[in-house]
Regions:
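A short acidic, Gly/Pro-enriched loop at the edge of an enzyme's catalytic core
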Residues: 107-114
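C-terminal lobe and adjacent flexible extensions of AdoMet/dcAdoMet transferase-like proteins
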Residues: 218-265
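Class I SAM-dependent methyltransferase SAM/SAH-binding core
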Residues: 50-105
Length: 265
């Protein structure tokens, strides 16, 4: 699995266009429609820097955030304390619990009413059987009829957006960091359906020089029928698959699938 240690500091800058409030609206709409009530406890699997976890916490949800990167969770914890200090998270709001665990073998203290997994995190499960194993664990920790909501990158995105394309992120200096520059190179193998990402990060130090760090990541492209099959084999009922946060129908050029599944017990 990727540890995200190098990219942790710029992860939120790279994903600055993500609308976490709209994503949370989607989850709350599903809770209302399919559960009829707010789940008492929600798992955010592969929570990263905790942006989604904290957005849900602001809305009064008791959250557990699980991620395999200690660096990402350190960012999440810092963000939590910043929200407490600023009053953005009210005194009566439950405080999220962050756990550093691999999503292929995580353990919880009990069950949850719903589980979410955002930003194609499940595509990082590249080994044979790993997706099904993760689904099985999620099912194990869900209450009867609990919801599992997640998204995955599509074959179209791997072929046409990633492919062998390179992307550059230029991040200006801020209050707590110098200027940063990230080069993201993709190499997608259509035969193995594995995409390798090579990230090079340049960070400005206090003396004006730039320090270089490198990180490699890898995602697997899953077909829609593979995801459906893995859900069915692990005891889930697939409720819906849509193309966007607004519930759009699937199309040939869909970049991201959004799934809602229910745990059958």
């Amino acid at each position: 699995m990727n540890d995200y240690n190098t990219i942790a500091g710029v992860y939120d800058s790279i994903n600055s266009g993500v609308d976490y409030r709209k994503w949370a609206d989607l989850f709350e709409g599903a809770f209302d429609k399919y559960l009829g009530e707010r789940p008492e406890l929600v798992l955010d699997l592969a929570c990263g820097t905790g942006r989604m976890t904290l957005e849900m916490a602001k809305r009064g949800y008791d959250m557990i955030g699980v991620d395999g990167s200690a660096e990402m969770l350190a960012r999440a914890t810092d963000a939590l304390y910043d929200m407490i200090d600023s009053g953005e998270l009210s005194e009566d709001s439950p405080r999220p619990l962050f756990l550093c665990q691999d999503m292929r073998e995580f353990e919880l203290y009990g069950t949850v009413g719903a589980a979410i997994c955002c930003l194609d995190s499940l595509n990082y499960l590249t080994g044979d059987g790993e997706l099904q194993k993760c689904f099985s664990l999620v099912h194990n920790y869900l209450d009867p009829d609990g919801l599992f909501m997640f998204d995955m990158n599509t074959p179209y995105k791997f072929t046409n957006i990633y492919g062998e394309n390179a992307y550059v992120y230029d991040m200006p200096a801020g209050e707590d960091a110098g200027a940063r520059f990230c080069v993201w190179q993709n190499f997608y193998d259509e035969e193995t359906r594995i995409c390798d990402f090579y990230l090079t990060l340049f960070e400005e130090s206090e003396d004006g020089k730039y320090e270089r760090s490198d990180e490699e990541q890898r995602e697997r492209c899953y077909r829609l029928d593979e995801v459906r099959d893995a859900l069915e084999k692990t005891g889930f009922e697939l409720i819906s698959v849509t193309a966007d946060l607004d519930g759009s129908e699937l199309a040939d050029d869909t970049h991201r699938w959004h799934f809602i599944a229910r745990a059958k017990k």
